[in-house]
């Protein structure tokens, strides 16, 4: 699963996702992509599950690019622990995804294969997404 090799600080604030994505809104690598429509935190496990679903449907043909990276440590305290005594330990890593952000890109497969593969991948994610494709040049 994806996570940073090292970070400056072990823990971060929750933060909020305001407005639309500033960058990463256009297809840079592949011909087809999956674009976020709503804001949400996506965990490293969800990204990996979606990636596996996409590559499995494509039968290892073509190429997949993951355009988001889980760099946000999410902490939680153990169950039945009283309030206070500091912040909990890091449980998992997540990526903040704003509307308009490209999550996955695909190339080297037909459009109907790409559409179905990304539909299966989108089912593993907690947000609404949209299938997009590069305009014919």
Curated annotation (Swiss-Prot):
InterPro entries xrefs: Ribosomal_uL16, Ribosomal_uL16_bact-type, Ribosomal_uL16_CS, Ribosomal_uL16_dom, Ribosomal_uL16_sf
Gene label: rplP
Protein function: Binds 23S rRNA and is also seen to make contacts with the A and possibly P site tRNAs.
Gene3D superfamilies assigned: Ribosomal protein L10e/L16 (3.90.1170.10)
GO biological process, one term: translation
Protein's name in the database: Large ribosomal subunit protein uL16
Keywords carried by this UniProt record: Ribonucleoprotein, Ribosomal protein, RNA-binding, rRNA-binding, tRNA-binding
The protein's assembly and partners: Part of the 50S ribosomal subunit.
Keyword rRNA-binding: yes
Organism: Bartonella quintana (strain Toulouse)
Cellular compartments per GO CC: cytosolic large ribosomal subunit
A single MF term (Gene Ontology): structural constituent of ribosome
Similarity comment: family membership: Belongs to the universal ribosomal protein uL16 family.
NCBIfam families, per database record: rplP_bact
